[in-house]
Amino acid sequence: MKWIEISITVEVAVIDEMAAIFNDIESNGYIEEIIENNPNLSRVTIYLEAHKDEEQWKQIIETALQDANISYKDMVSKT
């Protein structure tokens, strides 16, 4: 099975909200890493099935984050 990995850097305060969004989207869980030298930021990585391409998944996530008024620093994806 092929997976797409998407990493998003956000403020630590919104991690719980992001977890709820990921559960609604189709996430198989997520990994949270605190950004070195910046304890207020966290990198959240999720793994999604590749039945959609990277750009489709990024658009879905970006829309969900905007709808929830969650801003992010960056979003990176890879297969």
Locate the predicted segments by residue.
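N-terminal auxiliary segments of SAM/dcSAM-dependent transferases
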Residues: 2-79
